[in-house]
């Protein structure tokens, strides 16, 4: 069949149906969302949980959510901008920070449901394959599915760093090692040590050392915040180890104190009857004084 030009006549415009708003804005992949949201019909009121990961220019957002007609309900959330509290003050959007954010989300969620002592996850980080399995006689492992949004799911993407952090934190998320750093597509083999290096920020540390030797100015420009916070390449692994331990120790979100806002009034308030009478009396007195002065002169 040859090329057929779309005739945009009256019938075309009369029958035209716009796409969903979030599709028009390029924010939601509804093909993927349909498959992530629709639950098995024999599970009735059981929600299907998603682990949502979004990477922005300055932050990494991780959420556990489920869909309702009114909109998505957020069960738990963790953000990379919370990491300075746990000792990671720089590089809040790299792979290591994504892992920490995923770990924080998992520990926070399990703590909220009282399952943090039952499902400890992978305490010793080795970068290898790990899957959470339900324990007999205990509540089942919390299962959810990765929602990567419109991110390109290539090998080594930060989205999978957050996934690995959540799995090591004790959540059951179906996954394979094919998208983790260290997987070789040609030999079909996964090198866990390479993955561990990324989790511990050693790829960043190696680049820091390289720039130090090759181009001092580029190093100062690229890693200005690291220099400001006295973070050296040799300190990186220890910094992330301490952060992982601190997250496991206290993952609870601390609410910020509510800021008291003093209301300002820009227009004049209405005068009461007593104030109006007093104002009239003052004007009368002022007028009489002016009359007296005029008579005297």
UniProtKB/Swiss-Prot annotation:
Pfam families linked: Ribosomal_L18_c, Ribosomal_L5e
Cross-link position per record: Glycyl lysine isopeptide (Lys-Gly) (interchain with G-Cter in SUMO1): 220
Annotated GO biological process: cytoplasmic translation; translation at postsynapse; translation at presynapse
Modified residues (Phosphoserine): 185, 272
Residues modified as Phosphothreonine: 232
Family matches, as Gene3D superfamilies: 3.30.420.100
Composition bias type Basic residues, residue spans: 258-268
Principal location: cytoplasm
UniProt-listed SUPFAM superfamilies: Translational machinery components (SSF53137)
Disordered, as annotated region: 253-297
The organism's place on the tree of life at top rank: Eukaryota
Localization: Cytoplasm; Nucleus, Nucleolus
Role description: Component of the ribosome, a large ribonucleoprotein complex responsible for the synthesis of proteins in the cell. The small ribosomal subunit (SSU) binds messenger RNAs (mRNAs) and translates the encoded message by selecting cognate aminoacyl-transfer RNA (tRNA) molecules. The large subunit (LSU) contains the ribosomal catalytic site termed the peptidyl transferase center (PTC), which catalyzes the formation of peptide bonds, thereby polymerizing the amino acids delivered by tRNAs into a polypeptide chain.
Assembly description: Component of the large ribosomal subunit (LSU). Part of the 5S RNP complex, which is a LSU subcomplex composed of the 5S RNA, RPL5 and RPL11. Component of a hexameric 5S RNP precursor complex, composed of 5S RNA, RRS1, RPF2/BXDC1, RPL5, RPL11 and HEATR3; this complex acts as a precursor for ribosome assembly. Interacts with NVL in an ATP-dependent manner. Interacts with RRP1B. Interacts with IPO5, IPO7 and KPNB1; these interactions may be involved in RPL5 nuclear import for the assembly of ribosomal subunits.
Protein family per UniProt: Belongs to the universal ribosomal protein uL18 family.
The protein, known as: Large ribosomal subunit protein uL18
Naturally occurring in which organism (per UniProt): Mus musculus (Mouse)
């Amino acid at each position: 069949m040859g090329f057929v030009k779309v005739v945009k006549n009256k019938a075309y415009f009369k029958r035209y149906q716009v796409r969903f708003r979030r599709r028009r804005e390029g924010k939601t992949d509804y093909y993927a969302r349909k498959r992530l949201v629709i639950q098995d019909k024999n599970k009735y009121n059981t929600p299907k949980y998603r682990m949502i990961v979004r990477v922005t220019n300055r932050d990494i957002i991780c959420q556990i959510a489920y869909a309702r007609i009114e909109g998505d309900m957020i069960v738990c959330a963790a953000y990379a901008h919370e990491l300075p509290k746990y000792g990671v003050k720089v590089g809040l959007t790299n792979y290591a920070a994504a892992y920490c954010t995923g770990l924080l989300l998992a520990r926070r969620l399990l703590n909220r449901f009282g399952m943090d002592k039952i499902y400890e996850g992978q305490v010793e980080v080795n970068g290898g394959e790990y899957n959470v399995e339900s324990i007999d006689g205990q509540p089942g492992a919390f299962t959810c599915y990765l929602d990567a949004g419109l991110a390109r799911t290539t090998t080594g993407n930060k989205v999978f760093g957050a996934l690995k952090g959540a799995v090591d934190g004790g959540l059951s998320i179906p996954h394979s090692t094919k998208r983790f750093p260290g997987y070789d597509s040609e030999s079909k083999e996964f090198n866990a040590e390479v993955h561990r290096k990324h989790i511990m920020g050693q790829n960043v540390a190696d680049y820091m050392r390289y720039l130090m030797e090759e181009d001092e100015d580029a190093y100062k420009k690229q890693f200005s915040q690291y220099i400001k916070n006295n973070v050296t390449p040799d300190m990186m692994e220890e910094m992330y180890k301490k952060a992982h331990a601190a997250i496991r120790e206290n993952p609870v979100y601390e609410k910020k104190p509510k800021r008291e806002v003093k209301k300002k009034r820009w227009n004049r308030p209405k005068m009461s009857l007593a104030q109006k009478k007093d104002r009239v009396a003052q004007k009368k007195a002022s007028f009489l004084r002016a009359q007296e002065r005029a008579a005297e002169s």
